[in-house]
UniProtKB/Swiss-Prot annotation:
It comes from the Bacteria. This is Protein YchS. The lineage of its organism: Bacteria, Pseudomonadati, Pseudomonadota, Gammaproteobacteria, Enterobacterales.
Amino acid sequence: MVVGEGLLSAARFALRVVACGNALSLALKSNLGRSFSSFPAWAEYLITDSFESSGTFESDGGGGRITQRCALRPSGRCLRQRSLAGARVEP
């Protein structure tokens, strides 16, 4: 009986080691994949924001519209460009 109890505790210990190793491996894999991605997660939000605000129109107060566009720079910052679309020039 002593030999059987020793084998049982050894098997339990081996299962714990394997389970802990699997959990650690999954945690490291998800963290490494997230932090060392070639395409950062924050850039996805900027690109989504740039697509959503790519056609924003505002009034310039003179009857024309100011078109505001967002172009994504290589640095990841959003370059906002404003142009007058159909604005009237009053003398």
